[in-house]
């Protein structure tokens, strides 16, 4: 896009950033001071980097799925003699969103992301992945790896796993407590998912087997102070977890809008 168009009010783009090439992006809309809307005709992922920028700037945006659904409905009307209308288009769109949107859990180490994620997967009949569990298949015990290789090396491995899982759809994903310390993880998680932050008092957090949580309650308080703003910047919804997984699962209001 020419810099001469930065005064435009609407941005429409297609092709760049579609799976499996996400999160590629060629346009930085931060320079468009008068932008009022963004349309990206890509439908996989749900939110390209372009749309994530629009979301960050509170600019209305739309992906390509509504166009794809409407096209299919019109084809059915034309070739099969159906009489589907706006109501059917909206229902199909809601159903597809519900089926495809990932549920992402973030929060402090020991807050219960694994327990809650497993319960949500079982309740909704979804495939559940725990990032740390998946990493252990590749690098062995996480605590041992961090001790021997350092946290920076671990975060890079973690980011690679998040990027891999984030391209998929219809999953429940329990992340590690420190994933929010790597900014690029946000785009990988948000592109196809809604991010929920689980919270509970520091005194109730489990520290067993967690090398980065060792040091007792004071260390946990330090982590909480540092990471809370990061969790809040990632999350679309905050859910208090009181160690009752069924109640927490019921409290997660899965939303499929912006």
Outline where the language-model segments fall.
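ATP-dependent small-molecule kinase phosphotransfer cores
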Residues: 133-190
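NTP-dependent small-molecule kinase module
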Residues: 90-98, 119, 123, 229-256
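Conserved small/polar residues in nucleotide/adenosyl-binding loops
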Residues: 1, 5-14, 257-258
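Adenosine-phosphate binding glycine-rich loop
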Residues: 41-101
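Conserved lysine of the Walker
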Residues: 113
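A glycine- and Lys/Arg-enriched "phosphate-lid" helix/loop adjacent to the NTP-binding pocket
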Residues: 192-230
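Rossmann-like adenosine-cofactor binding region
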Residues: 8-61, 179-185
């Amino acid at each position: 896009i020419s810099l001469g168009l930065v005064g435009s009010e609407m941005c429409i783009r297609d092709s760049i950033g579609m799976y499996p090439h996400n999160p590629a992006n060629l346009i930085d809309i931060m320079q468009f001071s008068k932008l009022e809307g963004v349309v990206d005709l890509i439908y996989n992922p749900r939110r390209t980097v372009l749309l994530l920028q629009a979301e960050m700037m509170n600019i209305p945006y739309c992906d390509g799925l509504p166009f794809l659904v409407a096209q299919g409905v019109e084809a059915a009307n034309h070739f099969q003699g159906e009489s589907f209308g706006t109501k059917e288009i909206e229902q199909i769109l809601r159903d597809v969103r519900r089926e495809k949107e990932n549920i992402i859990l973030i929060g402090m180490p020991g807050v219960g992301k694994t327990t809650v994620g497993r319960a949500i997967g079982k309740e909704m009949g979804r495939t559940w992945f725990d990032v740390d569990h998946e990493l252990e298949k590749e690098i062995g015990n996480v605590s041992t790896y961090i001790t021997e290789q350092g946290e920076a090396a671990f975060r890079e491995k973690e980011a690679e796993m998040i990027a891999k899982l984030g391209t998929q759809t219809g999953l429940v994903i329990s992340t590690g407590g420190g994933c929010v310390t790597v900014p690029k993880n946000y785009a990988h998680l948000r592109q196809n998912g809604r991010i929920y932050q689980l919270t509970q008092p520091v005194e109730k957090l489990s520290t067993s087997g967690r090398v980065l949580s060792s040091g007792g309650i004071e260390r946990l308080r330090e982590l909480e102070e540092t990471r809370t703003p990061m969790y809040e910047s990632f999350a679309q919804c905050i859910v208090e977890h009181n160690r009752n997984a069924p109640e927490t699962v019921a409290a997660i209001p899965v939303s499929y809008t912006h």
